Amino acid sequence: MAKPKKENDLDLLIQLADALEAIPGDLSKNFTEVRFLEAELKDVYSQALSSIDDLLNRDTSVERRNLVARNLSLLLKSDDVQTRKKSHIAMYAEAITHSNVLRLEHCYQKMEMKLPNFFIPFTPEVIKEQKTSRPIRASRRRANLRNRRAKELLAAENASEEGDKKQIITDSGKLPETEELTETTNEDLDIKQFSPYSSESSANVSSYNKS
């Protein structure tokens, strides 16, 4: 007896590629046939409606009605055949898709037995990193928003202080610093007036010496 051939990795890859290619190819072929049948059925429906209108028309002769009735029966029979064909194609598409999926699963199982690390499992660590990175972005946005609000408040306070200074100038006509300067100059004048080196103090000293 001949020993059964062992499947190598290349044969498994070929079977896997064949199954992956067969699923969309068979489905597109079957759906195309169904669309053609639906287009033919639309023509049948329109002809059947026109035949029914002829039958309901009172002016139609008896011979014309008999002819329309025969044509209508033929249309209905063809409609029945096409409808059955459409349902058969749909059932065949379901069966062939199921068989292709089974082939695909069989290839996957063989691949996993031969190459345990062939299919990389889904790891949720990436999702965890995304979840941890989102709050960091949110905290940065909040910090930027707080800094921007603080800058806006500081600018508003500076603007209000400048407005108060302008209001003082318009009310008094001069700044408070000028008033302080005038007060200091008056004090200086009083000091000079009562200083021993002033002209009045020297005149008093001379009159005292003469006496």
UniProtKB/Swiss-Prot annotation:
Disulfide bonds: none
Single GO biological process annotation from the record: transcription initiation-coupled chromatin remodeling
Positions of region (Disordered): 155-211
Bias (Low complexity) ranges: 195-211
Record field: transmembrane: none
Ranges annotated as biased composition (Acidic residues): 178-188
Pfam families per the UniProt record, alphabetical: ING (PF12998)
Coiled-coil portions: none
A GO term from the CC aspect: chromatin
Name this polypeptide is given: Uncharacterized protein C16E8.12c
